[in-house]
Amino acid sequence: MKEAAPVEGAKATESIDALKVRIRELEKEVDRWKSQVKSVRYGLCWQDVPEAFDKDSEDKIPVLEEVSEKAIDAAGPLAGRPPHVIIEGDNYHALTCLNYTHRGKIDVIYIDPPYNTGSDGFTYKDRRFLTEFPDGQKVPREHPLRHSYWLSFMEKRLKLAKNLLSDRGVIFISIDDNEQANLKLLCDKIFGEGNLLTTFPRKGTGGRQDSKYFAIVHEYIQGYAKRLDKFESGRMAKGKNFPLFDESKNLHYKTQLLRKWGDNSRRENRPNLFYPIYYNTSTKEFSLSKSKNFLEIYPMLDLNNEGCWRWGKKTMEEAFHKGLVEIQKNRKGEWIPYERIYDNPNEESTKPYSSWIDDIDNSTGSSLLKEILQTHDFSYPKPVDLIDRIIRMSSMQKSTVILDFFAGSGTTLHATLNLNKEDGGNRRCILVQQSEGENNICECVTYERNRRVMCGYTSAKGERVEGLGGSLKYYKTGFVGKHPSKNASDADKVELAEKAGCLIALAENTLETVALPKAASGFFQIYSDNAEKKRYTCIYHNGDYERVPEFIDRIDELRKNDKRAKFAVYVFSWNSPDFFENEFDDLTNIEIKAIPKPILEIYKALNG
């Protein structure tokens, strides 16, 4: 018993020391919070929860690695165009890599992040509880940190995304009521309140009954410009804002709900606007008088709540006679009256409208995906027409670069391919998607959907659909070194230089690998684009310079084959590439750059 006392005393001392350490940590946390609260004068304030990542990626340097067997080069109308890109991996790491390859180069970003409904599977890895939840926690609706987790998750990614936008660039974010208000304030903070484009209400996955009082049928798209003074909105062509066609009038038109919505839309608000209209499904006639074989239709908000029409009886009667009313049957079999709004035939195009509440139903995204993949194991894919509209109104240019870093089913690339085919454009699309689920979503849905669109497929109905053609490169995020970028050792820098080939090729938009002897590939790599006027990216990544003469000879050989070709030459150097400049005195159209220092400098800046 006497011998045990010192042991117990030592244990008590250890516990006290651990408690002191924990107290100091909590004091630092309190000080950090006090500082944050003092700095906020107006706007959004939440508990910024530190995020953890997979163990293999912690404290390492992110790179991209090509999966060459997934490359696509398909014949068809879009063959020979610049390649598109899919990146498989956590979008935080992918965005970090893109901050080197595409800073200031992206014209349009569209994302469809988790809505944080409490049941959509949103998972957050709270660094403080990794031992308890190593794979992260699904965030239920009643979780006390539900909104803080989501805001912490989104803020990091949106800050990285902002760096990628060109001066004329724009970002559009799909969201619903769960986080729309928070997202608006977060984007005001990141992009600037003065760069708000608008909040677009749009038709969502209709008729959700999870709300106690209303059947929720709307969502939002939050839009911001990098610099509003540089933004040029594309105008919508006929058939886009007015997607329907009336052969009798030879005019395009769109429809708008005849029942009033929003404020003052209930019967008690406007009793004089609550009355029946009558419709004959055989003759397509309308009437305000009860007649045989005519349906009686009231402006119902839902089965038990009475609404009101937008027009009084006189205006309604006039609209009947002018052919400005039509009836559509919804998925529940209910007959719903709509106003027809006709296009102005004297205008070739029009400004985009800020409300998309009456068109582009989400259900079309599900049906199309099922047609292509012949299976449907993906919830709420966005419709192609929605992304088409966003791209069109984001720019009048046909060579924009588009990014979606919550790619999901890959709709954004599909829409880009369709639009390029329609107008002969050279738009390029980059998709980023995590490898979620037992069946890797990125491989089995994002990639496979677009592989079929490019190469052709047999639909669920057994019909052959010809491919659009085009090319695509597939990458995965990878990691090098044993330290984060700010503490990179010499060994880390050597490994980064050796593994940075795909990053550099993507930055230069030269994604085709030039074949080299196996022995040479351990020292240098060469990439090219697929354009008629060639550009080459040549990378000498080894610290041993014994093969530099062979490297130079290879470049000279390519230059002689095409004297118009341009070359970007990257060389491993601890500081600057001055050592190599004399070696290239006799060669023209060559720019020499050092690696890996510029990559590390960008990564360090991102991590503070």
PLM region spans:
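Conserved S-adenosyl-L-methionine
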Residues: 46, 53, 135, 151, ...
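SAM-dependent methyltransferase catalytic-core segment centered on the flexible catalytic loop
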Residues: 76-77, 92, 101-170, 178, ...
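PRPP-dependent phosphoribosyltransferase catalytic core
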Residues: 418, 422-608
